[in-house]
Amino acid sequence: VVAGGGDNAAGAVGVGMVDANQAMLSLGTSGVYFAVSEGFLSKPESAVHSFCHALPQRWHLMSVMLSAASCLDWAAKLTGLSNVPALITAARQADE
């Protein structure tokens, strides 16, 4: 018998998303909203689905959008910044 987890569930364990009510947003080739839960809480009418987590006795809610990181390129161009690192720097400075 072999156990494992999907890429998002395994990544969530790697960044410490292991307890109920913890959540993260991951941007890459897809955009994933990932929230840890203690049980099956699917809401398909809102495009949020429930899956087994990579850890025992844990579930997660997940909603996915494809090509998500491209929105950062769009935001950089929209604001007149040269690239995504410049956008992130500007966002951090605005938050100070």
Predicted regions and their residues:
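Active-site core segments that coordinate phosphate-bearing ligands/cofactors
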Residues: 1-96
